[in-house]
């Protein structure tokens, strides 16, 4: 990580999020009940969602940080994707119920009420807190590349937007004499929660499928390797995400006149260069093949996973 404080933040963000969102959830539920706001009650679900997500961060980061062992040669990084999927499924179910309830209230004019102004102030407090938590969790997510902390940042962004909508709804209900706005905002919030749950679910699904590192990452690895003295281009590269980390192996071209020791030294230099430039490389195995000068063939890429033996070999070499 770039700064020493990043490690502290990555370890504490789950507990901070858990405390903050518990307070916000209680405040929103209490104010929504006494203030008569369906939108604020729906907004409390955002904080409940975030509270559970923060709990998943605490559990997930603890498990995923465990070292490799014989039974888990790829590490424990996938646990974060599993927990993200659990959170998304739970809230898709809960918000489906809330969606039906919001529609019923919106269609029944006898249930339309103008909420108390205390709801407006609670919504503004929620906006401020969630904006601060969004930037905090986004910073940690960038540094750690953790999928569950990325989910946490997305949730805080959505919460700030939802609380802002609640505030606008209260203003409209009070000053424009439109009490139906409050249940309408509640309806919008439940739809937004459903869509957010779908995004989180699909992100977790892709993570569990060990997707390729992507063209941009592959090109960075190739570019870095080819800048190392003695490298006559990258012949083959295989890179994919395992959890939040990248596992890769590559074949580089070297002068046919080089000795085995010289080729090995070049491979080690490539490892050091790539791992030094790219922060999320967990494992990189580099081997060399003879390549004639002037051979400008482009590298080939593979998305097939590494075998168990290759994984253990790369951990020894890296």
From Swiss-Prot:
Residues 1-210 are annotated as: Transmembrane domain (TMD). Its main location: membrane. One of its GO terms (cellular component) is magnetosome membrane. One of its GO terms (biological process) is iron ion transport. Keywords: Biomineralization, Cell inner membrane, Cell membrane, Ion transport, Iron, Iron transport, Magnetosome, Membrane, Metal-binding, Transmembrane, Transmembrane helix, Transport. It is a multi-pass membrane protein. It comes from the Bacteria. Disruption phenotype: Cells have no magnetic response but still make empty magnetosome membranes; magnetosome proteins MamA and MamE localize normally. Deletion of genes mamH to mamV (amb0961 to amb0978) gives cells with no magnetosomes and no magnetic response. Fe cation 1 binds at residues 249, 285. InterPro entries: Cation_efflux, Cation_efflux_CTD, Cation_efflux_CTD_sf, Cation_efflux_TMD_sf, CDF_Transporter, Magnetosome_CDF-Related. It is found in: Magnetosome membrane; Cell inner membrane. Fe cation 2 binds at residue 264. Residues 211-318 are annotated as: C-terminal domain (CTD). The C-terminal domain (CTD) is probably responsible for hetero- and homodimerization; it assumes a V-shaped, dimeric metallo-chaperone-like fold that can open and close. Binds up to 3 divalent metal cations (probably iron in vivo); upon binding there is a conformational shift to a tighter dimer. This bacteria makes up to 20 cubo-octahedral magnetosomes of about 45 nm in diameter which contain membrane-bound crystals of magnetite (Fe(3)O(4)). Expression of just the minimal mamAB gene cluster (amb0961 to amb0978), including this gene, is sufficient to form a minimal magnetosome chain with small magnetite particles. Probably plays a role in biomineralization. Required for stable accumulation of MamB. Probably binds and transports iron. May nucleate iron crystal formation. This is Magnetosome protein MamM. It comes from Paramagnetospirillum magneticum (strain ATCC 700264 / AMB-1) (Magnetospirillum magneticum).
């Amino acid at each position: 990580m770039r700064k020493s404080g990043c490690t502290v933040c990555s370890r504490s963000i789950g507990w901070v999020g858990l405390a903050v969102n518990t307070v916000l959830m209680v405040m929103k539920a209490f104010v929504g009940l006494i203030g008569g706001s369906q939108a604020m009650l729906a907004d409390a679900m955002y904080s409940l969602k975030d509270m559970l997500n923060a709990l998943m961060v605490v559990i997930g980061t603890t498990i995923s940080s465990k070292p490799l062992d014989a039974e888990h040669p790829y590490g424990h990084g996938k646990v974060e994707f599993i927990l993200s999927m659990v959170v998304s499924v739970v809230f898709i179910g809960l918000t489906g119920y809330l969606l039906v309830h919001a529609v019923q209230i919106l269609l029944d004019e006898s249930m339309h009420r103008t909420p108390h102004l205390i709801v407006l102030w609670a919504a503004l407090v929620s906006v401020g807190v969630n904006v601060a938590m969004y930037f905090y969790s986004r910073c940690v997510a960038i540094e750690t590349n953790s999928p569950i902390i990325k989910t946490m940042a997305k949730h805080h962004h959505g919460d700030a937007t939802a609380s802002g909508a609640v505030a606008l709804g209260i203003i409209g209900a009070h000053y424009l004499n439109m009490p139906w706005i409050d249940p309408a905002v509640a309806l919008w919030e439940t739809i937004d929660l459903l869509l957010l749950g779908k995004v989180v679910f699909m992100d977790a699904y892709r993570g569990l499928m060990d997707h390729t590192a992507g063209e941009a990452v592959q090109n960075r690895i190739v570019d870095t390797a080819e800048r190392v003295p003695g490298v006559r281009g990258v012949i083959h590269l295989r890179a994919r995400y395992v959890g939040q980390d990248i596992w890769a192996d590559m074949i580089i071209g070297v002068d046919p006149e080089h000795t085995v020791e010289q080729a090995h030294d070049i491979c080690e230099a490539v490892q050091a260069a790539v791992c030094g430039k790219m922060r999320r490389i967990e494992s990189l195995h580099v081997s060399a093949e003879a390549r004639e000068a002037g051979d400008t063939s482009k590298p080939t890429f593979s998305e097939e996973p590494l075998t168990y033996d290759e994984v253990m070999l790369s951990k020894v070499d890296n």
